[in-house]
């Protein structure tokens, strides 16, 4: 993807209650400005299958330093989590919400990624339907719910296929 750094979700947690967060990792030796990135999501059962419901921008001028992470945490998370957060939001997954790291501008109306108006860099879940309480991950039933997912150390970029990412 021209202009996009290979950022990806390095950690995703649905720790019960509001102890939810995700981490985006910058595997490069450059500081990455997040102005052209966003995290788009659907809540459980999507309104339109395959299309995001909310497009969430990072604060203008937000960056991820080289080989560092940017943490987005739920507004009501435990203080320990909030102290690590670069951004807070009430729109974090409870395990059954599809989350994508995207590069590009927000379309005027929610649009399928095949439109070419933005690029998916990585997934936690997908926007293709209600998974119940969560998606299965590496043989763990509903692994995105009430678990913390940590990417393997040798992963250096996101995966545009949730099926591949989930193992």
Predicted regions and their residues:
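Activation on beta-sandwich/Ig-like modules and their edge loops
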Residues: 2-146
């Amino acid at each position: 993807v021209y202009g996009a750094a290979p950022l990806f979700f390095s950690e995703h947690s649905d720790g019960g209650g509001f102890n939810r967060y995700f981490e985006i990792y910058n595997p490069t030796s450059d500081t990455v400005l997040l102005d052209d990135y966003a995290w788009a999501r659907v809540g459980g059962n999507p309104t339109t299958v395959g299309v995001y419901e909310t497009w969430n921008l990072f604060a203008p001028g937000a960056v991820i330093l080289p080989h560092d992470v940017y943490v987005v945490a739920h507004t009501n998370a435990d203080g320990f989590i909030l102290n690590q957060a670069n951004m807070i939001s009430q729109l974090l997954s409870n395990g059954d919400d599809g989350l994508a790291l995207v590069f590009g501008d927000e379309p005027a109306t929610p649009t399928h990624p095949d439109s070419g108006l933005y690029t998916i860099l990585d997934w936690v879940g997908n926007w293709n339907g209600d998974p119940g309480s969560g998606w299965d991950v590496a043989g763990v039933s509903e692994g995105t719910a009430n678990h913390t997912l940590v990417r393997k150390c040798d992963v250096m970029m996101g995966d545009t296929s949730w099926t591949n990412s989930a193992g």
